């Protein structure tokens, strides 16, 4: 999530999703993101890395309010995220993979944490779970100091 450097905006949260050939996962991800945005002003930005399937047509049919960037080549994950960041208007920006379901309370929990720790907080990570509800260790990495 980005915070202090964002320009003033009426949008609370921008969600950036990079897509590559995961049409049905993408649909589920966007549905869960919309549910998580309840109570916030938000926008969802999908950057498609030239999927070559009908991901974007399907997305536009199901979610006409989602902002779409269509790349003519696979720009890679990092560059595609940067394209989404460049147009994001939210006070905070969330990177969300297209095969992720975000809990309906997750954004609220993150914002509550930020509100309590804003002076000491530069970013927020969440606990990730697999499809069976088991903790994914890659959601917590420690660096020795």
Predicted stretch roles:
Residues 1-35:
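N-proximal low-complexity "stem/linker" segments adjacent to membrane-targeting elements
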Residues 29, 55-56, 81, 105-107:
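Acidic donor-diphosphate engagement hotspot in glycosyltransferases and nucleotidyltransferases
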Residues 32, 48-57, 73:
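A conserved acidic beta->alpha catalytic loop
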Residues 41-50, 69-71:
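Short beta-strand/loop segment that forms part of the nucleotide-sugar
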Residues 70-88, 109:
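Glycine-rich, basic loop-to-helix element that forms the pyrophosphate-binding segment
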Residues 93:
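Short aromatic/hydrophobic "clamp" motif used to bind/position activated sugar donors
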Residues 97-101:
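The conserved acidic donor/metal-binding loop of glycosyltransferases
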Residues 104-138:
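Conserved donor NDP-sugar-binding/catalytic core segment of glycosyltransferases
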